[in-house]
């Protein structure tokens, strides 16, 4: 379906960049991102704590990273 939308320049540039890197059209990228953001997110708890999935390529955060970040805030 064709429609006209106003999209901020920085958002459009990011969508174009994703489209180039994934070999998709800008419209397909924006549709996929909109679909993903509109999908309800379920909260899963493990042992009483909320947990979430992270991408497989996400960096690992260690206890040392947390301590260092807390020390930087002081």
From Swiss-Prot:
GO terms for biological process: positive regulation of growth. It comes from the Bacteria. Keywords: Toxin-antitoxin system. Antitoxin component of a type II toxin-antitoxin (TA) system. Upon expression in M.smegmatis neutralizes the effect of cognate toxin VapC39. This is Antitoxin VapB39. The lineage of its organism: Bacteria, Bacillati, Actinomycetota, Actinomycetes, Mycobacteriales.
């Amino acid at each position: 379906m064709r429609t006209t939308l106003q999209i901020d320049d920085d958002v459009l540039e990011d969508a174009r960049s994703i489209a180039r890197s994934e070999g998709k059209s800008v419209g397909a990228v924006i549709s996929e991102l909109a679909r993903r953001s509109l999908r309800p997110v379920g909260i899963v708890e493990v042992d009483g704590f909320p947990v979430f999935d992270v991408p497989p390529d996400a960096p690992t955060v260690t206890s040392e990273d947390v301590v260092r970040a807390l020390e930087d805030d002081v």
